[in-house]
Amino acid sequence: MKKIFILTGEASGDKLASKVISKLQKINSNLEYLSVGGDNLKSLGIKSIYDLKEITYLGFTKVILNIITINKKINETVNAIIKYNPDLLFTVDSPDFTLRVAERVKKINPKIKTIHYVAPQVLSLIHISEP
């Protein structure tokens, strides 16, 4: 059975990941998952190694005040991924967190496959013409 570790860093990433994984579960039921996720992934039956709320800090000041906790969670996450030994590390959004973790994992296990997924951004241009 192939294993996928899903790594999100905030609620929006959890929501995006759950949409992808719910489709994947319909296509292939022979996949095993572990995550850092929230309620959306949990609703799909996917266990999270800790609650996503433990790493969600809004604003520069909150991040600075919690930098030690954040670094501990990064180390905890890297160790959990290495121990789980997934076939794929699926990172979603939150590049400051997810890509930092992925980089550390790749240093320990350079053969691990990774995919980083982000929501498409829409750029709206309004053309104002003069009469």
Which residue stretches match the model-derived regions?
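Active-site and donor-binding regions of nucleotide-sugar-utilizing enzymes
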Residues: 3-129
